[in-house]
Amino acid sequence: MLKNLPLSKEVIDLLKNYGTILHYEKGYLLQDCNRFDEGVCILISGIVKMSVKHNDKKILLYHLDCSKPIIINYTNTPNMSSDVICSTVIKDTTILNIPNDLFLELTSTYIELRDFMITSFQFHYMNIINKTQEISNQTLEELLLSYIKTKSRLYKSTEIKIPLLEISEDLNFSREAISRGLKNLENNEKIIRKTRSIILLDN
C-alpha cells in the first residue's frame, strides 16, 4: 500500500512501524478527526476535496488523489487554523498518520523525507495560486469545463454523476448560473446533460 511513496524502503518501513493506517468513508470531514491535528497525514488512496471556508460557505480549491502520494494536512501548524481549510473525503480514503514529533525527528535524519514534506507544501501552494488565477481570468463556462474535466480524470470516466447543488457550492455560483453555464457548454457541444449525470465530450 505504501510502495508508491517516493521514499526508500528504509524510510517506508519506519513509517509503517510507527505510523497508523486510517480509513475514512465518502463524506467524512477530516477535521473532525483528532489525528488530523495531532499527526502528519499522508494520502495513500482515495480522493479528498480541499475547500476554503468563507462566509459560512466552502469553496473548492482543488482535489487530492492517490496518483500523487502527498501530505494532506499542510495547515497543521500553530499559525494556521484548521477552521480555514476544509478537507472532505469524496471517495473512500486511506491515510497514513505519523505523530508530529516523530515525523519532524525523521525529517532531520532522512533528507528524502524532508524533500517529500517540502514537495507536498509546494504542491498545495501552487494549487492555491492556480485556483486564484482561474477565478481571476476564466469565465463561468471555462471554470465549469475545467471542473468537469477534473472530475472526469479523478473518476476515470467521461460520465460524471454530480448534483447541481454540489457544483454550485464548489464553484460559489448560484444554481441558476450553473444551469445556464451547463446549457451553454451543451450548446457548444462540450458536454451532454442527462437527468442525473454529465457526459464530457471535450476531453
Model regions and ranges:
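Short phosphate-coordinating micro-motif centered on Lys-Gly-acidic
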Residues: L29-R35
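Glycine- and acidic-residue-biased ligand/ion/polar-headgroup-sensing regions
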Residues: E38-S51, C66-K68
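Cyclic-nucleotide recognition modules
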Residues: V11, L61-T119
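Short, small/polar residue-rich loop motifs at catalytic or cofactor-binding pockets
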Residues: K16-N17, R35-D37
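Cyclic nucleotide-binding regulatory module and flanking cytosolic helices
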Residues: M1-K26, D65-N79
